[in-house]
A protein has these predicted regions:
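Beta-propeller blade termini and top-face loops
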Residues: 263, 268-270, 274-286, 291, ...
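Bacterial N-terminal signal peptides
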Residues: 7-18
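Primarily short, surface-exposed interaction patches in extracytoplasmic proteins
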Residues: 185-258, 272-320, 381, 421-694, ...
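Solvent-exposed helix-loop boundary motif
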Residues: 21-119, 128-191, 195-196, 211, ...
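Protein kinase-like catalytic domain
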Residues: 39, 47, 122-126, 254, ...
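Active-site histidine-acidic residue metal-binding/catalytic motifs
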Residues: 99-103, 116, 124-137, 142, ...
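Globin-like tetrapyrrole-binding proteins
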Residues: 860
C-alpha cells in the first residue's frame, strides 16, 4: 500500500511539473502570450492600475518595478533564479512564513500551469520585450493555440492574443447556421436520422405494449398517471388501429390543461422560479406566482416559442398595456437577489446585472455568459466586452411591482382568506412568554427578564414587518421591471466594481456579426431589450431553436441530443445526432415555433415508442455503452413532483384546480417547525393549509421557499431554485426508500387510497385489489399477486383489529430560543400556530379514525406506492 501511495504522489507531481515540456517557446514569447496577460488579470489591480495606490509599494507595470521591489526593500524578481524570487515564492502559496500568498484571495490563486509559466520565465532571465515587440509576437501564431483552427471575428478581447486565437471548428458547432439536412431514408424523419447512426451490429427493439405506452406518454405530457378508463379505451382503440389510436392519444394529452403544468415544471427548473428571494433574509415574493401561471398558460395555448421568448425579455416594451406581457417580464427577476440596509447599492445592482445576463444566456442561448465576466471567455469566442455590452441592455431597467388588476383568466381563490388571516395576526401579539406555559412544559424555570423583554420586542416587530410582506399578496401587482434607470456600464476588471475600465454601449454577442458596430442595439432607454429579444429570436440566430428543441428532446427521452442543454459552448457535450438536431430545429422554425407540433413529431416516432428491453443486454452494453443509440427506450424514475402528484391522483385527493396563490402542502413536521432565518429574525413556523383541497394541489403550485425545501421532494432530487437546472439527476440513495415507506405523509396517501377503494368497491376485497392495481399500474393483478395481496391483508387485518392506533394531535405552538444581542443572554418565547390551534384545520384521514380493514388495505396501497412498477416509467 505504501508503494502505491508513493507512485500516486509521483504521478501528481509529474502532472503539475510536466507543463513546461508541452510547448517550448522563446522566453519573450512566453512573456507576451502568458506572463503579461496574467499580470494584467491577477496582479495589476493592486500593483499598477493606480500608481498612486500601490499596495505594498510594489509596481508590477515594468521589469524595473519588480527589480526595485516594494516595502520589504527586497527585489521581487531575481532573473534566472525562480526559487529565490519573492514573486515566484508568493504565487506558489507554499512559503507564507516568508512571503504572503499572492493573489491574497484563495479563489484568485494561480493554477499550477500559471505558476509554471512564471517559473520558466524567471529561469529564462525574465525578459520584458518592449510594446512593439509584444505587438509583433501577438501577430504570430500562438504556440499554445489551435494550430489548425479557425479565427472568429468579434468585438475584440482584452488583449490581442485572445482576439487572434484560433478555435477547434468542431467545438464551434452551435455557432454555425442551422441547416436542414436531407432525411436519410423513407419513413418518419426522426427514425431515419436515429437509425442512420446506429452502431454496426445493433438493431432496434420492437414497439412497447399499449399499456406501457399510454403510461409513458401520459406522464411525459401531463405528469399524472392515466386513469383506468383512459387506459381501457386506449387499448381498445389500439387493437383496432394502433397508429390512429396513438395519434389521437397524443392530441388529447396536448389539449389537456395538465400539459401546460408539466411543461411549466420543466421551464421553471431552467429559470430558477421561487416565491422568495433567497440569501440570508429570503424576502417573500408575493406575486411571483403570476409569472408561474403565465408560463402554464403559454404552453397550453401553444404560444409560438419566439413570442414566448420576446415577452419574457421585453414584454413591457412590446405591449405595455397587455397583462400577460407585463407578467412575463418576471423572468428577468427570477434569480436569487437581496438588498438590505447593510448592502452597498452598487454591489447588489452589479450582482443583479451579472445574474440577468447569465440567465438570458443560459436559458435561451445555452451559454454561460458569466464565464466572460472577469476575462475573455476561455473556451468560446465571447469577449468580456460583449458580456458588459449585454449588461448595458439591462442597464436601463429597475425593479417594479406594477399595479395590475386580477385578470378573468387568473385563479384568485384564497386571496381574500389569506388577507383576513394575516390581518387577524396583525391585531394579535405574534408571540408570548414561556411563563404562559405550564411549568412542566417550560424549557427553563429561571431566565433574564430584561433579555426576554428586549428580545421578544424585536422579534415581535420583525413579525409585523413579515406580515406586511404577506399582506402584499392581496394587492394586485405584477412582479416586473420598468425602464426608469440609466446605469452607465463599464467593463469591470476582474469583475470588480472597484476597477471600472472603459464604458460600453448596449450590444449583443459579436461572434455572429464579426464586429462591435454590427452587434449594437439602440442606446435609447426604451427599446434595448426589444432589440435583444429580436436578435435572440431571429431565424438567423443559430442557437435559440437548437436550444429549445434539445430541451424538449430531453424532456421525453431523459437525455438531450447535445448533452449539456445549458452549455452549447466549447466545454459542452457535442450532439450525438447533429443532423437530427438541425432538422428538428429548422422544421420547428418553419412550422411557426410551435412546441406542440414539435412534441407530436417526436412522440409519433418509433424511436419514442420502443420497448425498454434488449434481447441480448451484453450486446447493447458493448455497442452502446453511453446509451445514445436509442435502440431501446431508457426507463426513468418519476420526478419528485410526479411522484407526489401521482400518489394524490391515485388516492383520489388531488385538487386539479389550476393557478393561483401558492399552496402549502403538508411537509415533514420536524422540518416545518425548525427555526428559519428570514428578514433579520426568525421566520414563522411552516404550517400547511387548513383544508385538504387547499394543500393537496399539484406540486407545481406549492410555495417554493428558497431556504425551506420539502424533504420529500429534495430526497427525490428536486433541484434547488438558485441555479438553473439543465437536467434532473436521478441518484438512488437509501433515504428515498425510507421516505417512501416510512413518511407519515405517504402513509396518509396510502390510507386515503384504501378509503377510496372501499368507497368505489364496497365489501369486495377482490375488486378492491383489482382496482388498486388498475389505478397504480394500469393493469390487472396476476393470480399470484392476487393471492399474495389477499394473504397479507388477512394477516394484517387480525393485527389491526387487536391494535388501536394512538391519536397524535398536531402541534399547537412551538418554543423558540435566541440570544439577545444587547445582553448576551438567552431568551425564549412561544409561537402559537394559528392554523393548527384554530378551528379551521381539517386533517387528512388518520389511522385512529379509520376502520381496521381500511388500515390493513392501506398497507397494500403503501407497498404499491413503493414498487418499481409505480415509481419508474418504462
Amino acid at each position: 500500500m505504501q508503494a502505491k501511495g508513493i507512485q500516486l504522489a509521483a504521478a501528481v507531481l509529474l502532472l503539475v511539473g510536466s507543463w513546461a515540456n508541452a510547448v517550448e517557446v522563446p522566453a519573450d514569447v512566453l512573456f507576451a502570450r502568458k506572463i503579461q496577460p496574467l499580470f494584467k488579470v491577477k496582479c495589476l489591480t493592486c500593483h499598477g492600475d493606480d500608481p498612486e495606490k500601490l499596495k505594498g509599494d510594489l509596481d508590477m507595470r515594468t521589469r524595473a518595478g519588480l527589480l526595485k521591489g516594494g516595502e520589504s526593500e527586497e527585489s521581487a524578481l531575481v532573473p534566472g533564479k525562480a526559487m529565490t524570487s519573492p514573486l515566484y515564492l508568493a504565487v506558489t502559496r507554499a512559503h507564507e512564513a516568508d512571503w504572503s500568498a499572492m493573489p491574497p484571495k484563495e479563489n484568485d490563486k494561480l493554477s499550477a500551469e500559471q505558476i509554471g509559466y512564471i517559473k520558466e520565465w524567471i529561469t529564462a532571465g525574465a525578459p520584458w520585450p518592449d510594446a512593439k515587440r509584444v505587438v509583433a509576437i501577438l501577430k504570430e501564431a500562438d504556440p499554445w493555440g489551435e494550430t489548425d483552427g479557425v479565427m472568429v471575428k468579434t468585438s475584440g478581447g482584452l488583449d490581442a492574443g485572445w482576439t487572434n486565437r484560433k478555435y477547434d471548428p468542431q467545438k464551434l458547432w452551435a455557432y454555425q447556421p442551422v441547416s436542414k439536412p436531407a432525411v436519410p431514408a423513407k419513413g418518419h424523419p426522426v427514425d431515419a436520422f436515429v437509425e442512420a447512426r446506429l452502431p454496426k451490429g445493433l438493431a432496434v427493439v420492437p414497439q412497447a405494449e399499449a399499456v406501457t405506452l399510454i403510461r409513458r406518454v401520459t406522464y411525459n405530457l401531463t405528469g399524472l398517471p392515466p386513469t383506468p378508463k383512459e387506459t381501457f379505451e386506449f387499448v381498445a382503440a389500439w387493437k383496432k388501429d394502433s397508429e390512429s389510436a396513438w395519434v389521437a392519444l397524443i392530441d388529447r394529452l396536448l389539449a389537456s390543461p395538465h400539459y401546460g403544468e408539466q411543461m411549466a415544471q420543466h421551464w421553471l427548473d431552467v429559470v430558477r422560479y421561487a416565491d422568495s428571494a433567497g440569501f440570508s433574509n429570503d424576502y417573500p415574493r408575493p406575486h411571483a406566482w403570476r409569472y408561474r401561471d403565465y408560463v402554464v398558460r403559454a404552453f397550453n395555448a401553444d404560444k409560438p416559442y419566439d413570442q414566448f421568448v420576446r415577452e419574457q425579455i421585453a414584454g413591457d416594451e412590446l405591449e405595455p398595456n397587455d397583462p400577460d406581457h407585463l407578467i412575463a417580464t418576471g423572468f428577468l427577476r427570477m434569480g436569487p437577489w437581496e438588498h438590505t440596509a447593510m448592502s452597498v447599492a452598487a454591489v447588489t445592482r452589479q450582482q443583479y446585472l451579472d445574474d440577468v445576463v447569465n440567465s438570458v444566456g443560459v436559458t435561451f442561448l445555452a451559454n454561460e455568459l458569466r464565464c466572460a465576466k472577469c476575462h475573455d471567455h476561455k473556451f468560446d469566442p465571447i469577449p468580456t466586452k460583449d458580456f458588459y455590452r449585454m449588461q448595458a441592455v439591462f442597464g436601463s431597467i429597475s425593479f417594479m411591482e406594477r399595479k395590475l388588476p386580477w385578470q378573468s383568466f387568473e385563479n384568485i381563490t384564497g386571496i381574500q382568506a389569506d388577507r383576513e388571516r394575516y390581518l387577524r395576526q396583525q391585531k394579535t401579539k405574534a408571540i408570548r412568554s414561556i411563563t404562559t406555559l405550564p411549568e412542566a412544559d417550560r424549557p427553563v424555570q429561571e431566565f433574564d427578564k430584561d433579555s426576554e423583554r428586549i428580545g421578544q420586542g424585536k422579534v415581535n416587530n420583525k413579525r409585523r414587518q413579515q406580515l406586511k410582506f404577506q399582506l402584499k399578496r392581496s394587492t394586485p401587482l405584477a412582479f416586473s421591471v420598468a425602464n426608469d434607470a440609466n446605469d452607465r456600464i463599464h467593463i469591470l476588471k476582474g469583475g470588480s466594481i472597484e476597477t471600472p475600465q472603459g464604458e460600453v454601449s448596449p450590444g449583443v454577442l459579436s461572434l455572429f456579426s464579426g464586429s462591435e458596430k454590427s452587434a449594437s442595439v439602440t442606446s435609447e432607454q426604451s427599446g434595448r431589450r426589444t432589440e435583444l429579444a429580436q436578435w435572440i429570436t431571429s431565424r438567423e440566430n443559430p442557437l435559440t431553436a437548437r436550444v429549445i428543441v434539445n430541451r424538449v428532446w430531453q424532456w421525453h427521452f431523459g437525455q438531450a441530443i447535445a448533452g449539456n442543454p445549458n452549455n452549447f459552448g466549447g466545454t459542452g457535450k457535442r450532439p450525438t445526432h447533429p443532423e437530427l438536431l438541425d432538422w428538428l430545429a429548422a422544421t420547428f422554425m418553419e412550422e411557426g415555433w410551435s412546441l406542440k407540433k414539435l412534441h407530436r413529431r417526436i412522440l409519433t416516432s418509433a424511436t419514442y415508442q420502443r420497448a425498454v428491453a434488449y434481447p441480448t443486454p451484453e450486446t447493447l452494453a458493448k455497442l452502446d455503452p453511453n446509451k445514445t443509440s436509442y435502440a431501446v427506450f431508457t426507463p426513468r424514475r418519476l420526478t419528485a413532483e410526479e411522484l407526489r402528484d401521482a400518489m394524490l391522483a391515485i388516492s383520489g385527493e388531488l385538487n386539479r384546480a389550476q393557478g393561483g396563490i401558492p399552496a402549502h402542502p403538508e411537509i415533514n413536521e420536524e422540518v416545518a417547525m425548525q427555526p428559519r432565518h428570514i428578514m433579520g429574525s426568525v421566520g414563522p413556523a411552516y404550517q400547511a393549509d387548513p383544508k385538504p383541497a387547499q394543500r393537496n394541489r399539484r406540486t407545481l403550485y406549492a410555495e417554493r421557499i428558497r431556504t425551506l425545501a420539502d424533504p420529500m421532494l429534495e430526497v427525490f432530487n428536486k433541484p434547488g431554485p438558485d441555479v438553473s437546472c439543465e437536467r434532473r439527476e436521478t441518484a438512488t440513495i437509501a433515504p428515498q426508500a425510507f421516505t417512501l415507506m416510512n413518511s407519515p405523509i405517504n402513509h396518509a396517501r396510502a390510507l386515503a387510497f384504501a378509503a377510496r377503494l372501499e368507497r368505489e368497491k364496497p365489501g369486495d376485497l377482490n375488486l378492491q385489489i383489482v382496482r388498486a392495481f388498475q389505478l397504480t399500474y394500469q393493469r390487472q393483478p396476476l393470480p399470484a399477486e392476487m393471492k399474495a395481496c389477499r394473504d397479507h391483508i388477512a394477516k394484517s387485518l387480525a393485527h389491526h383489529k387487536a391494535t388501536k392506533p394512538v391519536k397524535v394531535e398536531p402541534p399547537k405552538y412551538v418554543i423558540r430560543q435566541m440570544v439577545e444581542e444587547m445582553t448576551g443572554l438567552d431568551f425564549w418565547w412561544v409561537e402559537d400556530l394559528d392554523i393548527y390551534s384554530g378551528n379551521e384545520y381539517v386533517p387528512d384521514l388518520k389511522p385512529w379514525d379509520a376502520k381496521p380493514h381500511t388500515r390493513a388495505l392501506a398497507e397494500l396501497c403503501l407497498v404499491l406506492f413503493n414498487s418499481n412498477e409505480f415509481v419508474y416509467i418504462y
